[in-house]
Structure formats: C-alpha cells, structure tokens
A protein has these predicted regions:
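Active-site neighborhoods and metal-handling regions in enzymes and metal-associated proteins
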Residues: 1-219
C-alpha cells in the first residue's frame, strides 16, 4: 500500500509528533498562554525536521477536541483539564497524537481511563482484527473506571497528506464489521467523560483545509 520510504517517513513523523507532544506537556502549566503553547509546539515540529500535519489544538474542560486558537486568543491556562492534539508529517506521511493534562488535580482517574484505553486498544490492533473489537476494548476499559466513552468521536485512518481517512476506529462496539488490513495506518483516539458519552458542536471553526484551486473571476 505504501513504499518503504513512506513507511520510514511515517516512523520519523511519529517520533517527531511524540516529541512535540511531550514538549507541549512541559509548557502546560498555570499562567501559560494557550496560543503560546500552540505556536511553540508547531515550531518544535519544524525544528525537529517535519511539518505540522494540522494546526496544534488545545481544548479545555468540557470542550473535548478540535479547539484551535485564533491569533487574538488571550486564554490563560489555569486549573483546567487540557487536551493537546498535534501532528507532524514528512513527505505527506502523517502522524497524529494527543495528551491530556489535569491542572485541576480533580480528574486524574479520567485521564488514566483514556490513556489505559488507548494502550489496551493498541495492544490488540493488528491485521485481521475487527474495528468493533477495538471499540469494545476501549469502552470496556473506560467503563471500568466509572466513565463513559464518547461515541460520536472516533479514531481514524491516516493517508498520504490525509489526516482523516478510513477505517473509522470507534470508541465502542459499533457493530462495524470492517477488518484492519496489512499496511493500514491508524490513529486510536479514546475519549472518556463523566457525562452522557456524546458531544455537540458548540465552538466556531478555526481549522480550514485547502480543497482545490479556482480561477479568478473577471469583473
């Protein structure tokens, strides 16, 4: 499906994305400015030899994901639950990863539930495994902590210059019969919540993607 060079680029991009993620963790502390952390993480990705696969995103508290700071964002990190999502690519081979930091000190079990679910799912992900079985594993681990998996957020495949593609990796037993195949690249993305297990779109969009060129119209 992919060339040896592309696979090598994927491994390098994943290492850089992970290093940038951990660098971001070191910056997440009370008094830090959200926008400064986002910019620093993207700069770290470039410094390490890759390009950001998408804008670094920092989501706070009830906002589960996909919050991207605008240039005028003056949000200061305080006692929130903070999710950092960043990605890197080399030659189009895209790596996507995230972490959660609990500055409030109140949600350590919630953070652990998501992390353990991700690790457990990663252990069973292999060619021939049904995506619903991965979702069930995620749901079971999160439920063991007394939380719910968010069902309308999911993991996904990664392609060349494509951040989101098939297969969908659910966070529960969705009944999807799709099987992982040799050569697929996937991102497993568990989300644990003390709430109902569903999210709503409530924030404005700050992330845009180039679709195609269009000719300039004459007056």
């Amino acid at each position: 499906m992919f060339t040896d060079e592309q696979i090598l680029n994927w491994r390098k991009a994943a290492q850089i994305a992970a290093a940038a993620r951990e660098f971001g963790r070191s910056l997440i502390k009370p008094g830090a400015r959200l926008l400064d952390v986002s910019v620093a993480v993207e700069e770290k990705i470039r410094e390490l030899g890759a390009l950001p696969a998408f804008p670094a995103q920092i989501s706070l508290n009830h906002t589960a994901a996909h919050n991207c700071a605008d240039p005028n964002d003056a949000t200061i990190l305080e006692d929130q639950v903070i999710k950092l999502d960043c990605g890197a690519h080399i030659g189009g081979s895209v790596a996507d990863n995230a972490l959660t930091v609990d500055l409030s000190g109140k949600w350590s079990e919630l953070v652990k539930a998501s992390k353990d679910a991700c690790l457990a799912a990663g252990k069973i992900a292999a060619p021939g495994v049904c995506v619903s079985d991965i979702g069930k594993e995620i749901d079971d681990v999160i439920a063991s902590y007394g939380f719910k998996a968010i069902r309308n957020l999911c993991g996904h495949g990664l392609g060349l210059y494509i951040v989101h593609t098939g297969p969908t990796i659910p966070n529960f037993d969705s009944g999807d019969s799709e099987i992982l195949e040799e050569g697929m690249v996937i991102a497993i993305e568990p989300f644990a919540t003390p709430g109902a297990g569903l999210v709503q779109e409530i924030e404005k969009a700050n992330i845009f993607m180039f679709a195609h060129k269009r000719p300039i119209r004459s007056p």
